[in-house]
Amino acid sequence: MSLYHYFRPAQRSVFGDLMRDMAQMERQFTPVCRGSPSESSEIVNNDQKFAINLNVSQFKPEDLKINLDGHTLSIQGEQELKTEHGYSKKSFSRVILLPEDVDVGAVASNLSEDGKLSIEAPKKEAIQGRSIPIQQAPVEQKTSE
């Protein structure tokens, strides 16, 4: 007679309950996480521009901050909700290093009515190569004495 078979159904029941509870908790939190900036962002980097688009529909414009320090772009959102029944806080932060050929003086942002944050900057014009002529130094003449 083995005790292994005696305890095995109880073990299955405990882990089954645990897994079911974890799945239920995940289903409850999924709507909160859906649409967060981490899930829906797009970066465009081509010859004409650098752009990033984020879905920030869960944040008000006053909850968002965009900072530029050199070529480092920081995007932050923070929202707090206090009620008589509880407190909740949502936040996100993105730090993006802009390419060297981006015109950082022309970075602009736009927030659409449906909560799409768009940040764009044009690329600098490429410096055209040119030919540099070689100038010859004057030849010193030797004088004979």
Swiss-Prot record:
An annotated GO cellular component: Golgi medial cisterna
Domain of life: Eukaryota
A Pfam family the protein falls into: HSP20
GO BP, one annotated term: defense response to Gram-negative bacterium
GO molecular function, one term: unfolded protein binding
Domain sHSP: 32-137
Induction record: By heat stress.
Keywords: Stress response
DNA repair recorded as keyword: no
InterPro entries per record: A-crystallin/Hsp20_dom, Alpha-crystallin/HSP_16, Alpha-crystallin/sHSP_animal, HSP20-like_chaperone
Similarity remark: Belongs to the small heat shock protein (HSP20) family.
Protein name: Heat shock protein Hsp-16.1/Hsp-16.11
The species this protein was found in: Caenorhabditis elegans
